[in-house]
């Protein structure tokens, strides 16, 4: 078998790289970023990982729904307590269904990253027209709700 190389960049060992410092001479940067997602109930992607190949179930939908209803609020409280900024990869559908989350992100002044309309679809299997439509819908929704376009993108 012929081994293929990506040819995007040459190999470089850490021991041979130049020293890099972050602003203000800092040696370490940490990015706190999490996904805030919305799934279509019982349709689309979102299978139960305990049953590979099985269709979506009420149980795995509930795991995800818990995050928006309960889990995220504990996370916001912890971030506030530790005075840590965060970035949020957010599905556009969350903005329509969970307006309280928008208010908390705005109050904290956190960064918003586009993450598709829902996580019931996959960007990597879309044709160009569908992908462009999804990116535009997501960007427009984030801009409408936050007053500015997303700072970045993480495909669903």
Predicted regions and their residues:
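Catalytic alpha-helical scaffold of carbohydrate-active enzymes acting on polysaccharides/glycoconjugates
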Residues: 2-156
